[in-house]
Amino acid sequence: MISSNDFRTGTTIEIDGAVWRVVEFLHVKPGKGSAFVRTKLKAVKSGNVVEKTFRAGEMLPQAMLEKSSLQHTYMEGEDYVFMDMATYEETRLSADQIGESRKYLKEGMEVNVVSWNDTPLEVELPNSVVLEIKETDPGVKGDTATGGTKPAILETGAQVMVPLFLSVGEKIKVDTRNDSYLGRENG
């Protein structure tokens, strides 16, 4: 159990059999009446965001999530197959369970799979990944002076904005949290 006074960004709680993550919270102490905690909660499984208010000190069940490091080994139909490299146990997740993370997921990548009551909820990618540019407009000599960007499609199908001087076949580092270009990757 966790008190509403102890909420922090990222805290996970259980409400009506579902896991919710605290996205924002604000402790409010009005001049008249009792204190309360106004929160913005995100459903871990579906991604829905709701605003909910709790009395100060209200006790709620804390959802104990388990993180396991798994490697994406291959695709089977629409399912993504992950393997625990220590036990060689396979876990299958659908495209819906992976959600937006699938645009950066490639075979051989190590990810954290977050589970609750032995049910996989979400895939946590590393903060940055190295991917190859598969499709982009060719760079024209002299384009670098303006510092502009152009769209590029990466090997996983993700689309990011990259500097004009990059071309097809180059490996770049991308921030998975905000889809931004971080730099070229050497090697």
UniProtKB/Swiss-Prot annotation:
Involved in peptide bond synthesis. Stimulates efficient translation and peptide-bond synthesis on native or reconstituted 70S ribosomes in vitro. Probably functions indirectly by altering the affinity of the ribosome for aminoacyl-tRNA, thus increasing their reactivity as acceptors for peptidyl transferase. InterPro entries: Elong-fact-P_C, NA-bd_OB-fold, Rib_uL2_dom2, Transl_elong_fac_P/YeiP, Transl_elong_KOW-like, Transl_elong_P/YeiP_cen, Transl_elong_P/YeiP_CS, Transl_elongation_fac_P. SUPFAM superfamilies: Nucleic acid-binding proteins, Translation proteins SH3-like domain. CDD domains: S1_EF-P_repeat_1, S1_EF-P_repeat_2. NCBIfam families: efp, PRK00529.1. The keyword Protein biosynthesis applies. It comes from the Bacteria. GO terms for biological process: peptide biosynthetic process. Keywords: Cytoplasm, Elongation factor, Protein biosynthesis. Coiled coil: none annotated. Belongs to the elongation factor P family. GO terms for cellular component: cytoplasm. Its main location: cytoplasm. Pathway: Protein biosynthesis; polypeptide chain elongation. This is Elongation factor P. It is found in: Cytoplasm. One of its GO terms (molecular function) is translation elongation factor activity. PANTHER family: ELONGATION FACTOR P, ELONGATION FACTOR P (EF-P) FAMILY PROTEIN. HAMAP family: EF_P (MF_00141).
